[in-house]
């Protein structure tokens, strides 16, 4: 399904009698095969409607001449992949903070979709999503997120536009890092999850560290090629 000019989502059915066992926010490793042989990519689960069923939802942004996107964006129904996982630490904290701030750029939103579903049953008092995009055409799952904000008083959506002017109440001019600085963050009561562009994450972590945050309260996941993890693998 096409979400924007450069972004699509995909659904993979699990093998027979297999269901998902993961923490919302984690990712899986996919081994695909094309005419050049097998290759691996890592993708966060984007399941929202059903967290633990028998399918995996992915969001993929097109990369020029990218091997995975060339395969996925041109595939027909029936494409198969070998999948191992889950991996990753970008999950909800065990201790509920006064305020949870989740930050993403572009398709870095993906792992937060299952997290938002889990939050409906988790009792977090305040959750803020900072989502950075260049313009509104990149605001994927916009209707879902706006509907979620209307339904849940604990949730606030802040869309940061770097190449368009804000006009709606939930929109802000500039980058997510600028918006972080506007939040009056508190290292004693706030907990951060950061996902997306590596530079955004490095800059945000630098600011938060200077503001008194420890690494245990700022969980970071950079969207880069072939992410590594030492978690044990399990075939699906």
Predicted regions span which residues?
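Histidine-anchored nucleotide/phosphate-binding helix
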Residues: 111-120
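Ferredoxin-reductase
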Residues: 1-77
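Reductase modules of NAD(P)H-dependent flavoproteins
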Residues: 135-236
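Short, compositionally biased
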Residues: 42-53, 93-106, 211
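Short, Lys/Arg- and Gly-enriched loop/turn segments at beta-strand edges
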Residues: 36-44, 88-95, 230-231
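Helix-loop module immediately N-terminal to the HCX5R catalytic loop
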Residues: 79-90, 178-179
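Residues at the starts of beta-strands that form the adenosine-phosphate
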Residues: 80, 99, 125-128, 154-156, ...
């Amino acid at each position: 399904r096409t979400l924007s000019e450069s972004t699509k989502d995909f659904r993979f059915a699990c093998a027979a009698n297999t269901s998902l066992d993961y923490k919302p926010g984690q990712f899986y490793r996919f081994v695909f095969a094309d005419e050049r042989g097998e290759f691996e990519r890592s993708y966060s689960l984007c399941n929202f409607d059903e967290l633990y069923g028998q399918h995996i939802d992915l969001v993929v942004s097109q990369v020029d001449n990218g091997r995975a996107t060339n395969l996925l964006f041109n595939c027909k129904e029936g494409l198969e992949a070998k999948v191992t996982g889950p991996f990753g630490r970008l999950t909800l904290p065990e201790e509920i903070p006064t305020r949870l701030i989740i930050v993403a750029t572009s398709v870095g939103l993906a792992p937060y979709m299952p997290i938002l579903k889990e939050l409906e049953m988790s009792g977090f008092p305040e959750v803020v999503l900072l989502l950075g995009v260049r313009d509104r055409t990149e605001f994927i799952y916009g209707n879902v997120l706006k509907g979620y904000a209307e339904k849940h008083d604990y949730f606030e959506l802040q869309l940061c536009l770097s190449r368009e002017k804000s006009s709606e109440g939930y929109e802000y001019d500039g980058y997510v890092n600028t918006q972080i600085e506007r939040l009056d963050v508190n290292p004693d009561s706030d907990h951060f999850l950061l996902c997306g562009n590596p530079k955004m994450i490095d800059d945000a972590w630098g600011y938060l560290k200077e503001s008194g945050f420890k690494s245990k309260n700022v969980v970071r996941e950079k969207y880069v090629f072939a992410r590594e993890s030492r978690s044990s693998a399990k075939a699906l």
